[in-house]
């Protein structure tokens, strides 16, 4: 019975994913850019408040996990430019084959501002691209452990008002979120057009503390 329920949930997710991505793709590019800017401003405001409350006595630069937009996702380059202005470090995800884990694993690596803004590297131009360890320059882009992140901004396919979130189906963030520190600031970002009445949820699906949307 459980297997049937899980299969039903998977089918429901797939249908919702296809529908919402199509709706997001149909947004006017100018409107999408305006909304991305509004979302980024709110992200920056909340991060400034969070990092200000944490204090800067240690002189440690906050490390913020972001993402390079895939297709019609929210464009976070405004946040990157602000990070450059105030001195926050940024980390971005890359999909790399790991010997100790089956398949490809989402890792975060330290990325310089110029590279993040230009998005010419393969793992930024095509964020879903799977890479072999030998194909990735870990010396140029050092690995960041989850407990190093002070904040994480996540992409979403769909979300609801109860904390439900729908991704692309790989479970990457479901596996990554439990590895973060308890005091790591976490938020999803999405357009209002991606909000749905209810995101189908299986037992292993994690909710998200908040979604910044416009």
Predicted regions and their residues:
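Short Gly/Thr/Asp-enriched flexible loops that form oxyanion-binding sites at enzyme active sites
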Residues: 75-81, 163-177
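Surface-exposed, charge/polar-rich loops and edge strands
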Residues: 1-11, 15, 22-25, 134-152, ...
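N-terminal active-site beta-alpha-beta segment that forms phosphate/nucleotide-binding
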Residues: 2-144
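Conserved alpha/beta enzyme-core scaffold
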Residues: 90, 152-154
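Conserved residues at the C-terminal ends of beta-strands
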Residues: 67, 155, 214
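Short glycine-rich anion-binding loops that position phosphate/pyrophosphate groups of nucleotides
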Residues: 70-72, 157-161
């Amino acid at each position: 019975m459980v297997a049937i329920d899980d299969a039903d949930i998977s089918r429901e997710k797939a249908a919702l994913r296809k529908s919402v991505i199509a709706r997001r793709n149909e947004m006017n590019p100018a409107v999408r850019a305006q909304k991305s800017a509004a979302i980024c401003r709110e992200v920056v405001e909340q991060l400034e408040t969070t990092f200000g409350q944490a204090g800067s006595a240690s002189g440690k630069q906050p490390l913020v996990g972001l993402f390079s937009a895939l297709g019609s996702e929210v464009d976070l380059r405004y946040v990157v430019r602000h990070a450059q202005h105030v001195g926050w470090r940024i980390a971005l995800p890359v999909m790399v084959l790991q010997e100790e884990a089956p398949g490809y694993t989402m890792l975060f690596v330290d990325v310089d501002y110029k590279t993040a803004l230009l998005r010419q590297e393969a793992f930024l131009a095509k964020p879903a691209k799977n890479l072999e360890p030998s194909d990735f320059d870990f010396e140029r882009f050092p690995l960041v452990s989850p407990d190093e992140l002070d904040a994480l901004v996540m992409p979403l396919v769909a979300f609801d008002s109860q904390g439900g979130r729908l991704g692309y189906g790989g479970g990457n963030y479901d596996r990554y979120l439990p590895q973060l520190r308890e005091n790591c600031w976490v938020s999803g970002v999405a357009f209002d057009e991606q909000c749905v009445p209810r995101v189908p949820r299986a037992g292993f699906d994690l909710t998200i503390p908040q979604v910044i949307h416009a």
